[in-house]
């Protein structure tokens, strides 16, 4: 059995298309998706189209990321996002370009859970996803392959960040009922062993932080002799073609400074997206400002040149 693991696509349908072409040649049996499928990139409907194609072609086991959470929070209670704002313009652009069908799809995504092995009616071993609220002490023990725990940031915390809080990862591994913890969110490919358990972050498919740029990161789990073998991949995609889509969509008119920071991150694999946000908050705190106006964003952008 072969299962691909992807995370943090951030609307990059060029990267997803390249990865799907690669996975077809690998003859995989399914795809695990760890969230952040959309937001920030151009033409959200193109991304949704490739996602639907992926789900039609492969069995998929998907959980929600923090970007989907943001969109749903805006659906349930409007967040005062503004077009053209560096603070919220990219989120607003994505939200306005989603259909009711898309929003319902994100609503039905579980936040986390476990993937276990069972026999189907034909006696074939197949993966079965169990949402976390339905997991019992016996769920992982009864799995016919080493169980996989799926989350975006951390179990029970979509926005949990193991990169900022490594002690949180060790605590979760120590208490893990599954064999492998699969998580994303940091955009950095990583594998760690602790307390007899494994943590795997497949990296970001659409916005990888690798100091290189232009590569989609993901992983493949292969079941051999009742053990998961892990292989991590970094494959190139048509970055120039994707960046040209930013111009066609006039994305800078929607997201201003943050749209430019996103393009820069894609190009070099350094997180200027986060660095810009961080610097804006520092400037705002120093000036005791609560409104992150465009002058602060432009100042932060100049400082990071």
PLM feature spans:
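Core catalytic region of metal-dependent phosphoesterases/phosphodiesterases
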Residues: 4-6, 11-97
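Active-site-proximal beta-strand elements of phosphoester/diester hydrolases
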Residues: 2-10, 146-155, 199-203
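Active-site neighborhood of divalent metal-dependent phosphoester bond hydrolases
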Residues: 54-137, 145, 163-172, 177
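Glycine-rich phosphate-binding loop signature in dinucleotide/nucleotide-binding domains
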Residues: 23-27, 144, 175-177, 220
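Ligand/cofactor pocket segment of small-molecule handling proteins
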Residues: 153-200
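Conserved hydrophobic/aromatic beta-strand scaffold that supports enzyme active sites
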Residues: 112-114, 150, 191, 218-220
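Acidic, His/Gly-rich catalytic cores of divalent-metal-dependent hydrolytic chemistry
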Residues: 194-202, 206-305
